[in-house]
């Protein structure tokens, strides 16, 4: 939910009282037309708040927490669960980790340390995150709390996106820290959410060979289903064009 323009202007006055709109846009990298349009509409995007916060060395989480819609972000950060951390490891990183385990190394090949994990978010980070915290009823609770239709919520997950409002609502519905979904959706970084340095790597290292291999297998199966649907859709499209001559 975008923040009200009036509340945004009060907040901006508090962190940059002497800065002009041109100054703010220049240091934050936001186009002046973009900010002007948001102010005219009376709704300022959360991404705008985050970009300006970073430019003025203000915590994006603390900045968002000053707005009523995101008051749940206030207070000391809550650590992510083990499942949340693992969900933010990309499938390629999981595969590299599997191959780097001693159990997978052949007699001819020495075990090599895998490269550092790629930064969150990744190609399926949003759906993986929701699946990691879902007890089977989270989607229903989010729909009841926000009014979003279940099919619309599922569509966002399939597209690997989640609005900040729904990300926080999902966290609350699952009983986890309120910033995990914002990391999964790419609005804020792990560090900005208060995640300890190296937390994802530590979570990965704690997985047994069996658990790691099973997780990588599940990810590959999910990827296979997506690719098959894409291939089927492409084949149908080509058939339609052929029938049209």
Describe each region flagged by the PLM.
Residues 1-21, 65-66, 80-139:
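A short, Lys/Arg-rich alpha-helix, primarily the initiator
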Residues 20, 31-33, 45, 59, ...:
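Short coil turns linking two alpha-helices in DNA-binding domains
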Residues 20-25, 52, 138-145, 170:
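Short alpha-helical "recognition helix" segments of helix-turn-helix
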Residues 28-29, 56, 146, 174:
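Core residues of bacterial helix-turn-helix
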Residues 29-44, 145-162:
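Recognition helix of helix-turn-helix/homeodomain-like DNA-binding domains
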Residues 41-48, 71-75, 158-166, 190-191:
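Short, solvent-exposed alpha-helical "recognition" segments
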Residues 46-63, 165-181:
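DNA major-groove recognition helix of helix-turn-helix/homeodomain DNA-binding modules
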Residues 65-104, 184-231, 240:
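Short, charged recognition helix plus adjacent turn
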């Amino acid at each position: 939910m975008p923040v009200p323009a009036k509340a945004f202007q009060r907040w901006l006055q508090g962190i940059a009282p002497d800065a002009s709109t041109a100054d703010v846009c220049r240091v934050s990298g936001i186009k002046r037309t973009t900010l002007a349009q948001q102010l005219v509409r009376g709704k300022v995007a959360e991404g705008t708040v985050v970009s300006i916060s970073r430019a003025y060395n203000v915590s994006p989480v603390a900045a968002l927490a000053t707005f009523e819609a995101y008051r749940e972000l206030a207070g000391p950060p809550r650590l992510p669960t083990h499942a949340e951390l693992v969900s933010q490891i990309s499938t390629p990183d999981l595969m590299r980790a599997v191959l780097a385990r001693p159990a997978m190394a052949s007699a001819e090949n020495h075990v090599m340390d895998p490269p550092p994990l790629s930064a969150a978010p990744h190609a399926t980070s949003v759906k993986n995150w929701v699946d990691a915290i879902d007890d089977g009823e989270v989607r229903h609770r989010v729909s009841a709390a926000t009014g979003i239709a279940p099919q619309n919520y599922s569509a966002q997950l399939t597209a690997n996106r989640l609005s900040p409002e729904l990300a926080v609502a999902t966290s609350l519905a699952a009983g986890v820290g309120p910033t995990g979904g914002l990391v999964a959706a790419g609005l804020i970084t792990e560090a900005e959410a208060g995640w300890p340095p190296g937390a994802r790597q530590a979570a990965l290292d704690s997985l047994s060979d069996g658990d790691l291999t099973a997780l990588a297998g599940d990810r590959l199966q999910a990827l296979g289903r997506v690719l098959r649907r894409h291939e089927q859709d492409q084949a149908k499209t080509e058939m339609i064009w052929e029938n049209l001559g």
